[in-house]
Amino acid sequence: MHSFQIFSDGACDLTLEAQNAYQISTVPFYVSFDGKTYLKELKELTLDHFYHHLIEEKGFPKTSLPSVHDFVEAFTPALEAGKDILSLHITHTLSGSMQSALTAKLMLEEEFPNAKIHIVDSHNATGSQALLLMEAARMQQEGKSLEEVVSYLEQAKKDTRIIFMIGSLTHLQRGGRIGKIAALSSNILKIKPIIVLRDGEIHVGGATRSRKKGIAELVKLTAEHFQKSGENPADYIAMVGTTDVTEEIAPTEALLKAELPQLELVSPLQIGATISSHTGPGTTGICIAKRYECYSL
């Protein structure tokens, strides 16, 4: 059985330390503050620098997806070492990253005809994409085959969720993610929109006037997922993700533990530049994914 290397685009928001621990290689997105100079997230641009610009300078960063060349450059050393490749990507509804990787795959298959290169749409982003990667890495470490890991990802992405609250719709509206009327109404009413990313699509989860109530609503919607689906919380792992409002991590985790004590919480995650360029500051979310042992592979 060939060994394989796990890749992801940078939208998974795994830290460099986590990438090393899980032996996951990422291909970063690019971020620009002036529309001219683009820097690779984490590798050329720290999150501290990014959030300073986003919050203190009230900037509107732009992002650019990894190029075909970026994926070819990332995949080639693994293929030359005789490894197969599994690459997990942000949902295609939010980015064309997966298409870049698919084009790279077609090019590389000519040079490495015996290699297996699997490009998978996670239907998710940021923390929920990270949870799928963490389970994939655990499977790899426990000796599961490439095909078993791909089977898990294709099944689990349908059960994976991220439910998040954002400070306002200003950044989403500026990026063309929502209609102007929705953005205007939100800003006038000073509400905090709650959004659910499910099956690769963005759904409105509600709205609240305070962040404290918003956190409670995030937990409520997470609990409702289990109530409506009949799923067992003990079969899932979860994490809290946030942009700049790290003080919300502890109260969110506390409410989540009280409401769903069987749900295993892993270390929280800081949402990176790729996603927060669109959501803006003041974003907090709950991510859940089902363990691989719960599926027939």
What are these regions (language model features)?
Residues 2-6, 264:
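Short active-site oxyanion
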Residues 4, 83-87, 236-238:
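Generic beta-sheet signal
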Residues 5-65:
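N-terminal glycine-rich anion-binding loop in soluble enzyme alpha/beta folds
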Residues 54-55, 79, 140, 173:
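Hydrophobic residues in alpha-helical segments
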Residues 83-87, 115-120:
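Short, flexible active-site-proximal loops enriched in glycine and acidic residues
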